[in-house]
Protein backbone atom coordinates (compact mmCIF):
# COMPACT_ATOMS: atom_id res chain seq x y z
CA UNK A 1 0.00 0.00 0.00
CA UNK A 2 1.24 3.50 -0.77
CA UNK A 3 1.02 6.44 1.61
CA UNK A 4 1.23 9.65 -0.47
CA UNK A 5 0.37 12.06 2.34
CA UNK A 6 2.26 10.32 5.13
CA UNK A 7 5.27 10.01 2.82
CA UNK A 8 5.46 13.80 2.62
CA UNK A 9 6.14 14.06 6.35
CA UNK A 10 9.89 13.83 6.76
CA UNK A 11 10.49 16.10 9.74
CA UNK A 12 8.69 17.73 12.69
CA UNK A 13 6.34 20.42 11.43
CA UNK A 14 5.80 18.96 7.96
CA UNK A 15 2.23 18.04 8.87
CA UNK A 16 1.43 21.75 9.15
CA UNK A 17 2.03 22.11 5.40
CA UNK A 18 -0.94 19.91 4.57
CA UNK A 19 -4.31 21.42 3.79
CA UNK A 20 -7.13 20.95 6.29
CA UNK A 21 -9.04 19.02 3.65
CA UNK A 22 -6.19 16.48 3.50
CA UNK A 23 -6.17 15.67 7.21
CA UNK A 24 -8.91 13.00 7.28
CA UNK A 25 -7.11 11.14 4.47
CA UNK A 26 -3.80 11.49 6.33
CA UNK A 27 -5.34 9.97 9.43
CA UNK A 28 -6.64 7.05 7.38
CA UNK A 29 -3.17 6.52 5.88
CA UNK A 30 -1.58 6.56 9.33
CA UNK A 31 -4.08 4.06 10.65
CA UNK A 32 -3.55 1.69 7.72
CA UNK A 33 0.24 2.06 8.00
CA UNK A 34 0.14 1.18 11.69
CA UNK A 35 -1.99 -1.90 11.07
CA UNK A 36 0.32 -3.10 8.30
CA UNK A 37 3.56 -2.25 10.09
CA UNK A 38 2.76 -3.43 13.61
CA UNK A 39 1.18 -6.64 12.37
CA UNK A 40 4.57 -7.41 10.80
CA UNK A 41 6.91 -6.35 13.62
CA UNK A 42 4.73 -6.63 16.70
CA UNK A 43 4.06 -3.79 19.09
CA UNK A 44 1.26 -1.87 20.78
CA UNK A 45 -1.55 -1.70 18.27
CA UNK A 46 -5.01 -0.92 19.64
CA UNK A 47 -3.96 2.06 21.78
CA UNK A 48 -2.18 3.69 18.84
CA UNK A 49 -5.10 3.21 16.49
CA UNK A 50 -7.21 5.20 18.93
CA UNK A 51 -5.09 8.38 19.12
CA UNK A 52 -4.35 9.10 15.46
CA UNK A 53 -6.56 12.18 15.02
CA UNK A 54 -5.66 13.55 18.45
CA UNK A 55 -1.93 13.30 17.73
CA UNK A 56 -2.26 14.85 14.28
CA UNK A 57 -4.19 17.77 15.79
CA UNK A 58 -1.54 18.25 18.47
CA UNK A 59 1.26 18.37 15.92
CA UNK A 60 -0.70 20.91 13.88
CA UNK A 61 -1.43 23.15 16.87
CA UNK A 62 1.89 22.93 18.71
CA UNK A 63 5.46 23.91 17.90
CA UNK A 64 7.74 20.99 18.72
CA UNK A 65 10.22 20.68 20.36
CA UNK A 66 9.60 24.05 22.05
CA UNK A 67 6.22 22.73 23.12
CA UNK A 68 6.40 19.43 24.96
CA UNK A 69 4.21 16.35 24.58
CA UNK A 70 4.20 13.59 27.18
CA UNK A 71 2.35 10.29 26.94
CA UNK A 72 0.82 8.22 29.72
CA UNK A 73 1.49 5.48 28.93
CA UNK A 74 4.21 5.97 26.32
CA UNK A 75 3.18 3.09 24.09
CA UNK A 76 0.57 5.36 22.42
CA UNK A 77 3.32 7.40 20.74
CA UNK A 78 3.49 5.71 17.31
CA UNK A 79 1.64 8.45 15.41
CA UNK A 80 3.83 11.01 17.17
CA UNK A 81 6.89 9.19 15.85
CA UNK A 82 5.48 9.11 12.33
CA UNK A 83 4.81 12.86 12.42
CA UNK A 84 8.38 13.58 13.54
CA UNK A 85 9.96 11.91 10.52
CA UNK A 86 10.55 8.36 11.74
CA UNK A 87 8.37 6.42 9.31
CA UNK A 88 11.30 4.44 7.88
CA UNK A 89 12.27 3.24 11.34
CA UNK A 90 9.03 1.31 11.79
CA UNK A 91 10.46 -1.57 9.76
CA UNK A 92 12.63 -2.29 12.81
CA UNK A 93 10.23 -1.22 15.55
CA UNK A 94 11.23 -2.62 18.98
CA UNK A 95 14.15 -4.50 17.44
CA UNK A 96 17.79 -4.17 18.44
CA UNK A 97 19.21 -0.80 17.33
CA UNK A 98 15.81 0.01 15.85
CA UNK A 99 12.98 2.32 16.79
CA UNK A 100 11.84 2.18 20.40
CA UNK A 101 8.20 1.40 21.12
CA UNK A 102 8.18 4.20 23.71
CA UNK A 103 9.23 7.86 23.65
CA UNK A 104 12.97 8.25 24.08
CA UNK A 105 14.76 11.63 24.15
CA UNK A 106 17.90 9.95 22.78
CA UNK A 107 15.93 9.10 19.65
CA UNK A 108 14.42 12.54 18.98
CA UNK A 109 14.34 15.97 20.65
CA UNK A 110 10.56 15.78 20.17
CA UNK A 111 10.39 12.87 22.63
CA UNK A 112 10.17 14.63 25.97
CA UNK A 113 10.35 11.80 28.47
CA UNK A 114 10.58 8.00 28.69
CA UNK A 115 7.21 6.70 29.87
CA UNK A 116 6.69 2.97 30.24
CA UNK A 117 4.71 2.84 33.48
CA UNK A 118 1.29 4.41 33.97
CA UNK A 119 -0.10 7.29 36.05
CA UNK A 120 3.23 9.14 36.34
CA UNK A 121 3.31 11.50 33.36
CA UNK A 122 1.11 14.24 34.83
CA UNK A 123 3.54 14.71 37.71
CA UNK A 124 6.42 14.87 35.23
CA UNK A 125 4.52 17.35 33.06
CA UNK A 126 3.83 19.59 36.05
CA UNK A 127 7.55 19.58 36.82
CA UNK A 128 8.45 20.50 33.24
CA UNK A 129 5.79 23.23 33.12
CA UNK A 130 7.01 24.66 36.41
CA UNK A 131 10.62 24.57 35.16
CA UNK A 132 9.59 26.52 32.06
CA UNK A 133 8.02 29.15 34.31
CA UNK A 134 11.09 29.42 36.52
CA UNK A 135 13.43 29.68 33.55
CA UNK A 136 11.21 32.08 31.61
CA UNK A 137 10.97 29.72 28.64
CA UNK A 138 8.02 29.83 26.23
CA UNK A 139 5.98 26.84 25.18
CA UNK A 140 3.14 24.64 26.31
CA UNK A 141 3.39 21.30 28.08
CA UNK A 142 0.76 18.81 26.96
CA UNK A 143 0.29 15.45 28.63
CA UNK A 144 -1.97 12.78 27.11
CA UNK A 145 -3.24 10.56 29.90
CA UNK A 146 -5.18 7.40 29.15
CA UNK A 147 -8.29 6.83 31.23
CA UNK A 148 -6.67 3.68 32.60
CA UNK A 149 -4.05 5.86 34.29
CA UNK A 150 -6.84 7.41 36.35
CA UNK A 151 -7.26 4.08 38.13
CA UNK A 152 -3.81 4.66 39.64
CA UNK A 153 -3.31 6.96 42.59
CA UNK A 154 -0.29 8.90 41.40
CA UNK A 155 -2.26 10.88 38.84
CA UNK A 156 -4.35 12.35 41.68
CA UNK A 157 -1.21 13.32 43.56
CA UNK A 158 -0.24 15.28 40.47
CA UNK A 159 -3.67 16.87 40.11
CA UNK A 160 -3.52 17.92 43.74
CA UNK A 161 -0.37 19.94 42.97
CA UNK A 162 -1.27 21.43 39.61
CA UNK A 163 -1.51 25.00 40.98
CA UNK A 164 -2.16 27.79 38.43
CA UNK A 165 0.06 26.60 35.59
CA UNK A 166 -1.33 28.30 32.51
CA UNK A 167 1.20 26.52 30.29
CA UNK A 168 -0.14 23.04 31.08
CA UNK A 169 -2.78 21.07 29.17
CA UNK A 170 -3.84 17.65 30.40
CA UNK A 171 -5.70 15.61 27.78
CA UNK A 172 -7.74 12.69 29.06
CA UNK A 173 -7.76 10.05 26.32
CA UNK A 174 -11.00 8.38 27.32
CA UNK A 175 -11.42 5.14 25.39
CA UNK A 176 -13.25 3.30 28.17
CA UNK A 177 -10.33 0.86 28.28
CA UNK A 178 -6.84 0.75 29.68
CA UNK A 179 -5.33 -2.63 28.86
CA UNK A 180 -8.19 -4.61 30.22
CA UNK A 181 -11.53 -2.88 30.69
CA UNK A 182 -11.40 -0.05 33.20
CA UNK A 183 -12.78 -0.72 36.64
CA UNK A 184 -13.80 1.21 39.72
CA UNK A 185 -15.54 4.44 40.58
CA UNK A 186 -13.38 6.59 38.31
CA UNK A 187 -14.52 4.59 35.30
CA UNK A 188 -18.12 5.04 36.43
CA UNK A 189 -17.57 8.78 36.87
CA UNK A 190 -16.18 9.20 33.36
CA UNK A 191 -19.09 7.22 31.97
CA UNK A 192 -21.46 9.64 33.67
CA UNK A 193 -19.64 12.60 32.12
CA UNK A 194 -19.79 10.99 28.70
CA UNK A 195 -23.45 10.07 28.84
CA UNK A 196 -25.30 12.80 30.75
CA UNK A 197 -27.15 14.70 27.96
CA UNK A 198 -28.65 17.29 30.32
CA UNK A 199 -25.24 18.25 31.61
CA UNK A 200 -23.75 18.86 28.21
CA UNK A 201 -26.78 20.19 26.34
CA UNK A 202 -27.14 22.89 28.96
CA UNK A 203 -23.41 23.49 28.94
CA UNK A 204 -23.29 23.85 25.16
CA UNK A 205 -26.24 26.27 25.09
CA UNK A 206 -24.86 28.40 27.90
CA UNK A 207 -21.34 28.50 26.45
CA UNK A 208 -22.75 29.60 23.09
CA UNK A 209 -24.78 32.36 24.71
CA UNK A 210 -21.89 33.62 26.80
CA UNK A 211 -19.52 33.63 23.83
CA UNK A 212 -21.84 36.14 22.11
CA UNK A 213 -21.26 38.75 24.82
CA UNK A 214 -18.99 41.49 23.44
CA UNK A 215 -15.47 41.50 24.85
CA UNK A 216 -13.51 44.69 25.50
CA UNK A 217 -9.94 44.18 26.61
CA UNK A 218 -8.17 41.58 28.70
CA UNK A 219 -9.73 42.75 31.94
CA UNK A 220 -13.22 42.18 30.57
CA UNK A 221 -12.19 38.76 29.30
CA UNK A 222 -11.21 37.73 32.81
CA UNK A 223 -14.42 39.15 34.26
CA UNK A 224 -16.51 37.28 31.74
CA UNK A 225 -14.59 34.08 32.36
CA UNK A 226 -15.29 34.42 36.05
CA UNK A 227 -18.93 35.12 35.24
CA UNK A 228 -19.12 32.05 33.08
CA UNK A 229 -17.76 30.00 35.96
CA UNK A 230 -20.49 31.34 38.24
CA UNK A 231 -23.23 30.70 35.69
CA UNK A 232 -21.78 27.28 34.92
CA UNK A 233 -21.85 26.24 38.55
CA UNK A 234 -25.32 27.64 38.98
CA UNK A 235 -26.71 25.45 36.21
CA UNK A 236 -24.80 22.21 36.54
CA UNK A 237 -22.39 20.66 38.97
CA UNK A 238 -18.70 21.29 38.40
CA UNK A 239 -16.51 18.34 37.58
CA UNK A 240 -13.94 16.98 40.00
CA UNK A 241 -11.28 18.27 37.62
CA UNK A 242 -12.49 21.84 38.03
CA UNK A 243 -12.55 21.41 41.78
CA UNK A 244 -8.85 20.48 41.59
CA UNK A 245 -7.88 23.63 39.70
CA UNK A 246 -8.32 22.74 36.04
CA UNK A 247 -10.51 24.44 33.48
CA UNK A 248 -12.50 21.43 32.25
CA UNK A 249 -13.50 21.14 28.58
CA UNK A 250 -15.36 18.19 27.13
CA UNK A 251 -16.11 15.51 26.40
CA UNK A 252 -15.26 16.05 22.73
CA UNK A 253 -14.95 13.69 19.78
CA UNK A 254 -11.31 12.63 19.61
CA UNK A 255 -11.71 11.34 16.06
CA UNK A 256 -12.79 14.69 14.58
CA UNK A 257 -9.35 15.91 13.57
CA UNK A 258 -10.51 19.36 12.41
CA UNK A 259 -12.44 20.00 15.62
CA UNK A 260 -9.48 18.84 17.69
CA UNK A 261 -7.05 21.10 15.83
CA UNK A 262 -9.33 24.12 16.21
CA UNK A 263 -9.85 23.44 19.89
CA UNK A 264 -6.15 22.94 20.64
CA UNK A 265 -5.25 26.08 18.72
CA UNK A 266 -7.81 28.10 20.67
CA UNK A 267 -6.41 26.81 23.95
CA UNK A 268 -3.05 28.49 23.33
CA UNK A 269 -4.22 31.54 25.32
CA UNK A 270 -5.23 30.15 28.66
CA UNK A 271 -5.51 31.50 32.19
CA UNK A 272 -5.42 28.20 34.06
CA UNK A 273 -4.33 24.62 33.52
CA UNK A 274 -6.64 22.99 30.99
CA UNK A 275 -8.24 19.57 31.32
CA UNK A 276 -9.44 18.45 27.89
CA UNK A 277 -11.64 15.35 27.97
CA UNK A 278 -11.37 13.53 24.62
CA UNK A 279 -13.41 10.43 23.80
CA UNK A 280 -11.75 7.92 21.45
CA UNK A 281 -12.19 4.33 20.38
CA UNK A 282 -9.34 1.98 21.16
CA UNK A 283 -8.47 -0.14 18.14
CA UNK A 284 -10.29 2.16 15.71
CA UNK A 285 -9.97 1.06 12.11
CA UNK A 286 -9.37 -2.64 12.77
CA UNK A 287 -12.64 -4.39 13.52
CA UNK A 288 -11.23 -7.23 15.69
CA UNK A 289 -9.27 -4.66 17.71
CA UNK A 290 -12.38 -2.50 18.12
CA UNK A 291 -14.30 -5.50 19.45
CA UNK A 292 -11.48 -6.91 21.62
CA UNK A 293 -8.99 -4.07 22.28
CA UNK A 294 -7.40 -5.92 25.20
CA UNK A 295 -6.30 -8.72 22.89
CA UNK A 296 -4.59 -6.21 20.59
CA UNK A 297 -2.98 -4.07 23.28
CA UNK A 298 0.45 -5.59 22.62
CA UNK A 299 0.84 -8.05 19.79
CA UNK A 300 3.57 -10.14 18.27
CA UNK A 301 3.60 -10.31 14.51
CA UNK A 302 0.11 -11.43 13.55
CA UNK A 303 -1.80 -12.80 10.59
CA UNK A 304 -4.73 -10.42 10.35
CA UNK A 305 -6.83 -13.06 8.62
CA UNK A 306 -6.68 -15.48 11.57
CA UNK A 307 -7.62 -13.85 14.85
CA UNK A 308 -8.96 -15.41 18.06
CA UNK A 309 -11.29 -14.45 20.89
CA UNK A 310 -9.13 -13.37 23.83
CA UNK A 311 -11.53 -14.38 26.59
CA UNK A 312 -10.46 -18.03 26.67
CA UNK A 313 -7.67 -18.10 24.11
CA UNK A 314 -6.27 -21.57 23.47
CA UNK A 315 -2.69 -20.33 23.03
CA UNK A 316 -0.36 -21.70 25.67
CA UNK A 317 2.08 -19.44 27.48
CA UNK A 318 3.37 -19.30 31.02
CA UNK A 319 0.72 -16.65 31.70
CA UNK A 320 -2.20 -18.72 30.41
CA UNK A 321 -0.95 -21.85 32.16
CA UNK A 322 -0.64 -19.87 35.39
CA UNK A 323 -4.14 -18.42 35.05
CA UNK A 324 -5.88 -21.63 34.02
CA UNK A 325 -4.11 -23.65 36.73
CA UNK A 326 -5.04 -21.07 39.36
CA UNK A 327 -8.66 -21.27 38.19
CA UNK A 328 -8.61 -25.06 38.67
CA UNK A 329 -7.15 -24.69 42.16
CA UNK A 330 -9.94 -22.26 42.96
CA UNK A 331 -12.46 -25.06 42.42
CA UNK A 332 -11.10 -26.83 45.51
CA UNK A 333 -9.91 -23.86 47.58
CA UNK A 334 -12.81 -21.47 48.28
CA UNK A 335 -10.49 -19.07 50.12
CA UNK A 336 -8.41 -18.46 46.99
CA UNK A 337 -8.74 -15.00 45.44
CA UNK A 338 -7.00 -13.53 42.39
CA UNK A 339 -5.93 -9.90 41.97
CA UNK A 340 -4.50 -8.10 38.97
CA UNK A 341 -3.70 -4.48 38.13
CA UNK A 342 -5.40 -3.79 34.79
CA UNK A 343 -3.78 -6.86 33.19
CA UNK A 344 -6.48 -9.54 33.20
CA UNK A 345 -5.49 -10.97 29.84
CA UNK A 346 -1.75 -10.36 30.15
CA UNK A 347 -1.53 -12.33 33.39
CA UNK A 348 -3.94 -15.07 32.35
CA UNK A 349 -6.39 -14.27 35.13
CA UNK A 350 -9.25 -14.06 32.62
CA UNK A 351 -9.49 -17.83 33.19
CA UNK A 352 -9.92 -17.32 36.93
CA UNK A 353 -12.53 -14.62 36.39
CA UNK A 354 -14.48 -16.91 34.08
CA UNK A 355 -14.81 -19.57 36.80
CA UNK A 356 -14.71 -17.54 40.02
CA UNK A 357 -15.95 -14.06 39.19
CA UNK A 358 -16.86 -13.29 42.80
CA UNK A 359 -13.26 -13.89 43.89
CA UNK A 360 -11.55 -12.05 41.04
CA UNK A 361 -10.45 -8.44 41.49
CA UNK A 362 -9.06 -6.09 38.86
CA UNK A 363 -8.04 -3.01 40.84
CA UNK A 364 -6.95 -0.95 37.84
CA UNK A 365 -3.50 0.47 37.26
CA UNK A 366 -2.83 0.47 40.99
CA UNK A 367 -0.13 -1.99 41.98
CA UNK A 368 0.35 -0.46 45.42
CA UNK A 369 -3.33 -0.84 46.20
CA UNK A 370 -3.34 -4.38 44.79
CA UNK A 371 -0.73 -5.53 47.30
CA UNK A 372 -2.23 -3.76 50.32
CA UNK A 373 -5.69 -4.99 49.31
CA UNK A 374 -4.27 -8.52 49.20
CA UNK A 375 -2.80 -7.98 52.66
CA UNK A 376 -6.23 -7.06 53.97
CA UNK A 377 -7.78 -10.17 52.47
CA UNK A 378 -5.01 -12.36 53.87
CA UNK A 379 -5.36 -10.86 57.34
CA UNK A 380 -8.92 -12.21 57.39
CA UNK A 381 -7.99 -15.75 56.45
CA UNK A 382 -8.31 -15.63 52.67
CA UNK A 383 -5.57 -16.70 50.25
CA UNK A 384 -4.96 -13.91 47.72
CA UNK A 385 -2.74 -14.33 44.68
CA UNK A 386 -1.46 -11.11 43.13
CA UNK A 387 -0.42 -11.55 39.49
CA UNK A 388 1.56 -8.60 38.13
CA UNK A 389 4.43 -8.22 35.68
CA UNK A 390 7.84 -8.21 37.32
CA UNK A 391 8.55 -4.66 36.15
CA UNK A 392 5.35 -3.37 37.77
CA UNK A 393 5.95 -5.10 41.10
CA UNK A 394 8.68 -2.50 41.57
CA UNK A 395 5.92 0.06 42.10
CA UNK A 396 4.55 -1.85 45.09
CA UNK A 397 7.79 -2.68 46.87
CA UNK A 398 6.95 -0.60 49.94
CA UNK A 399 3.62 -2.40 50.29
CA UNK A 400 5.30 -5.80 49.82
CA UNK A 401 7.65 -4.98 52.69
CA UNK A 402 5.36 -3.07 55.03
CA UNK A 403 1.93 -4.59 54.50
CA UNK A 404 2.75 -8.21 53.62
CA UNK A 405 6.25 -9.18 54.74
CA UNK A 406 6.19 -7.52 58.17
CA UNK A 407 2.83 -9.14 58.88
CA UNK A 408 4.01 -12.48 57.44
CA UNK A 409 0.72 -12.80 55.59
CA UNK A 410 -0.28 -15.60 53.25
CA UNK A 411 -0.02 -13.78 49.93
CA UNK A 412 1.22 -15.43 46.75
CA UNK A 413 2.91 -13.15 44.22
CA UNK A 414 2.67 -14.34 40.61
CA UNK A 415 5.63 -12.61 38.97
CA UNK A 416 4.87 -12.56 35.25
CA UNK A 417 7.34 -11.55 32.50
CA UNK A 418 10.27 -12.41 34.78
CA UNK A 419 13.78 -12.26 33.36
CA UNK A 420 14.73 -10.83 29.98
CA UNK A 421 11.79 -9.32 28.10
CA UNK A 422 11.96 -8.66 24.36
CA UNK A 423 10.76 -5.59 22.51
CA UNK A 424 9.72 -3.14 25.21
CA UNK A 425 13.23 -2.24 26.36
CA UNK A 426 14.44 -0.75 29.60
CA UNK A 427 11.03 0.06 31.08
CA UNK A 428 9.74 -3.52 31.04
CA UNK A 429 12.63 -5.81 32.00
CA UNK A 430 11.92 -8.35 34.74
CA UNK A 431 15.42 -8.47 36.18
CA UNK A 432 15.07 -7.04 39.69
CA UNK A 433 12.60 -9.33 41.47
CA UNK A 434 15.01 -12.12 42.60
CA UNK A 435 17.04 -9.51 44.45
CA UNK A 436 14.19 -7.50 45.95
CA UNK A 437 12.11 -10.47 47.09
CA UNK A 438 15.08 -12.32 48.57
CA UNK A 439 16.34 -9.25 50.42
CA UNK A 440 13.22 -9.31 52.60
CA UNK A 441 13.15 -13.06 53.07
CA UNK A 442 10.28 -14.00 50.74
CA UNK A 443 10.79 -17.48 49.23
CA UNK A 444 10.97 -17.42 45.44
CA UNK A 445 10.21 -20.28 43.05
CA UNK A 446 11.20 -20.26 39.37
CA UNK A 447 9.58 -23.04 37.32
CA UNK A 448 11.31 -23.58 34.00
CA UNK A 449 8.43 -25.29 32.20
CA UNK A 450 4.67 -25.72 32.33
CA UNK A 451 4.85 -29.00 34.23
CA UNK A 452 6.75 -27.37 37.08
CA UNK A 453 4.38 -24.39 37.14
CA UNK A 454 1.38 -26.72 37.31
CA UNK A 455 3.02 -28.73 40.10
CA UNK A 456 4.26 -25.93 42.33
CA UNK A 457 1.34 -23.53 42.06
CA UNK A 458 -1.17 -25.73 43.96
CA UNK A 459 1.51 -26.67 46.49
CA UNK A 460 2.25 -23.03 47.22
CA UNK A 461 -1.43 -22.14 47.52
CA UNK A 462 -2.39 -25.05 49.75
CA UNK A 463 0.72 -24.99 51.97
CA UNK A 464 0.98 -21.24 52.56
CA UNK A 465 2.97 -20.22 55.60
CA UNK A 466 3.70 -16.59 54.84
CA UNK A 467 4.32 -14.73 51.58
CA UNK A 468 5.68 -16.57 48.54
CA UNK A 469 6.65 -15.56 45.01
CA UNK A 470 6.60 -17.66 41.86
CA UNK A 471 8.26 -16.16 38.79
CA UNK A 472 7.97 -17.24 35.18
CA UNK A 473 9.08 -15.99 31.79
CA UNK A 474 7.15 -14.23 29.09
CA UNK A 475 5.89 -16.44 26.29
CA UNK A 476 5.98 -20.20 25.97
CA UNK A 477 8.16 -22.97 27.37
CA UNK A 478 11.24 -24.04 25.44
CA UNK A 479 11.50 -27.55 24.04
CA UNK A 480 14.70 -28.42 25.90
CA UNK A 481 13.15 -27.37 29.22
CA UNK A 482 9.77 -28.95 28.55
CA UNK A 483 11.56 -32.27 28.05
CA UNK A 484 12.79 -32.14 31.65
CA UNK A 485 9.28 -32.58 33.04
CA UNK A 486 8.86 -32.08 36.78
CA UNK A 487 10.45 -34.02 39.61
CA UNK A 488 9.02 -31.97 42.46
CA UNK A 489 12.55 -31.36 43.76
CA UNK A 490 13.86 -27.97 44.81
CA UNK A 491 16.83 -28.50 42.49
CA UNK A 492 17.82 -31.10 39.92
CA UNK A 493 20.89 -32.29 38.07
CA UNK A 494 19.54 -31.96 34.52
CA UNK A 495 22.63 -32.99 32.56
CA UNK A 496 25.52 -35.16 33.66
CA UNK A 497 28.84 -36.38 32.26
CA UNK A 498 31.14 -39.04 33.74
CA UNK A 499 34.03 -37.52 35.65
CA UNK A 500 32.78 -33.95 35.34
CA UNK A 501 34.71 -31.42 37.44
CA UNK A 502 32.75 -28.46 36.07
CA UNK A 503 29.18 -27.59 37.09
CA UNK A 504 26.88 -25.08 35.40
CA UNK A 505 23.98 -23.84 37.53
CA UNK A 506 20.94 -21.73 36.65
CA UNK A 507 17.17 -21.41 37.02
CA UNK A 508 14.11 -20.63 34.95
CA UNK A 509 14.44 -19.80 31.27
CA UNK A 510 18.21 -19.36 31.48
CA UNK A 511 18.52 -23.10 32.21
CA UNK A 512 18.18 -23.67 28.47
CA UNK A 513 21.51 -21.94 27.96
CA UNK A 514 23.46 -24.04 30.44
CA UNK A 515 22.15 -27.23 28.81
CA UNK A 516 23.41 -25.95 25.47
CA UNK A 517 26.70 -24.85 27.04
CA UNK A 518 27.43 -28.35 28.39
CA UNK A 519 27.10 -29.68 24.84
CA UNK A 520 29.50 -27.03 23.53
CA UNK A 521 31.98 -27.93 26.26
CA UNK A 522 31.73 -31.60 25.41
CA UNK A 523 32.77 -30.75 21.86
CA UNK A 524 35.94 -29.31 23.42
CA UNK A 525 36.48 -32.50 25.47
CA UNK A 526 35.34 -30.84 28.70
CA UNK A 527 32.83 -32.76 30.79
CA UNK A 528 30.34 -30.55 32.64
CA UNK A 529 27.22 -31.23 34.69
CA UNK A 530 24.19 -28.92 34.72
CA UNK A 531 21.97 -28.08 37.69
CA UNK A 532 18.64 -26.28 37.64
CA UNK A 533 17.15 -24.62 40.70
CA UNK A 534 13.38 -24.51 41.15
CA UNK A 535 13.38 -22.73 44.49
CA UNK A 536 15.94 -19.99 44.10
CA UNK A 537 15.50 -18.40 47.53
CA UNK A 538 16.31 -19.57 50.04
CA UNK A 539 18.88 -21.74 48.32
CA UNK A 540 17.73 -25.37 48.41
CA UNK A 541 18.98 -27.57 51.22
CA UNK A 542 21.75 -29.86 49.99
CA UNK A 543 22.76 -27.67 47.03
CA UNK A 544 26.16 -26.66 48.39
CA UNK A 545 26.88 -30.29 49.31
CA UNK A 546 25.95 -31.41 45.79
CA UNK A 547 28.38 -28.88 44.33
CA UNK A 548 31.21 -29.43 46.80
CA UNK A 549 33.33 -31.76 44.64
CA UNK A 550 33.48 -29.58 41.53
CA UNK A 551 36.62 -27.58 40.78
CA UNK A 552 34.80 -24.94 38.73
CA UNK A 553 31.23 -23.71 39.12
CA UNK A 554 29.52 -21.28 36.76
CA UNK A 555 26.23 -19.67 37.75
CA UNK A 556 24.08 -17.92 35.13
CA UNK A 557 20.93 -15.87 35.76
CA UNK A 558 18.90 -13.47 33.65
CA UNK A 559 18.59 -10.98 36.49
CA UNK A 560 20.79 -8.30 38.03
CA UNK A 561 24.12 -9.37 39.48
CA UNK A 562 24.13 -7.22 42.62
CA UNK A 563 22.06 -8.88 45.30
CA UNK A 564 21.09 -11.68 42.94
CA UNK A 565 20.93 -15.42 43.47
CA UNK A 566 24.37 -15.99 41.94
CA UNK A 567 26.06 -13.78 44.50
CA UNK A 568 24.16 -15.53 47.27
CA UNK A 569 25.28 -18.97 46.07
CA UNK A 570 28.88 -17.83 45.78
CA UNK A 571 28.81 -16.59 49.37
CA UNK A 572 27.14 -19.80 50.58
CA UNK A 573 29.81 -21.94 48.91
CA UNK A 574 32.54 -19.85 50.48
CA UNK A 575 30.93 -20.17 53.89
CA UNK A 576 30.77 -23.94 53.37
CA UNK A 577 34.52 -24.03 52.79
CA UNK A 578 34.50 -24.64 49.04
CA UNK A 579 37.71 -23.32 47.41
CA UNK A 580 37.21 -23.80 43.68
CA UNK A 581 36.79 -21.24 40.90
CA UNK A 582 33.41 -19.50 40.81
CA UNK A 583 32.17 -17.77 37.65
CA UNK A 584 29.08 -15.58 37.74
CA UNK A 585 27.16 -14.45 34.66
CA UNK A 586 24.28 -12.05 35.32
CA UNK A 587 22.86 -8.77 34.05
CA UNK A 588 25.42 -6.02 34.60
CA UNK A 589 23.66 -3.18 32.80
CA UNK A 590 20.30 -2.85 34.52
CA UNK A 591 18.92 -0.61 31.74
CA UNK A 592 18.54 -3.00 28.82
CA UNK A 593 17.48 -1.59 25.47
CA UNK A 594 14.87 -3.20 23.23
CA UNK A 595 16.01 -6.35 21.45
CA UNK A 596 15.09 -10.01 21.18
CA UNK A 597 15.78 -12.30 24.14
CA UNK A 598 18.56 -14.01 22.18
CA UNK A 599 20.19 -10.65 21.48
CA UNK A 600 19.84 -9.53 25.08
CA UNK A 601 21.46 -12.76 26.27
CA UNK A 602 24.34 -12.30 23.88
CA UNK A 603 24.84 -8.68 24.94
CA UNK A 604 24.97 -9.73 28.60
CA UNK A 605 27.16 -12.81 27.99
CA UNK A 606 24.32 -15.08 29.05
CA UNK A 607 24.18 -17.15 25.86
CA UNK A 608 25.55 -20.69 25.72
CA UNK A 609 28.59 -19.68 23.67
CA UNK A 610 29.66 -17.05 26.22
CA UNK A 611 29.15 -19.43 29.14
CA UNK A 612 31.19 -22.19 27.50
CA UNK A 613 33.94 -19.76 26.49
CA UNK A 614 34.29 -18.50 30.07
CA UNK A 615 34.63 -22.03 31.41
CA UNK A 616 37.25 -22.90 28.81
CA UNK A 617 39.24 -19.75 29.61
CA UNK A 618 39.06 -20.53 33.33
CA UNK A 619 40.28 -24.14 33.18
CA UNK A 620 43.20 -23.60 30.81
Which sequence ranges carry the predicted segments?
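Alpha-helix N-cap/helix-initiation motif
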Residues: 43-47, 113-117, 148-151, 362-367, ...
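Thiamine diphosphate
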Residues: 92-124, 134-138, 164-295, 311-354, ...
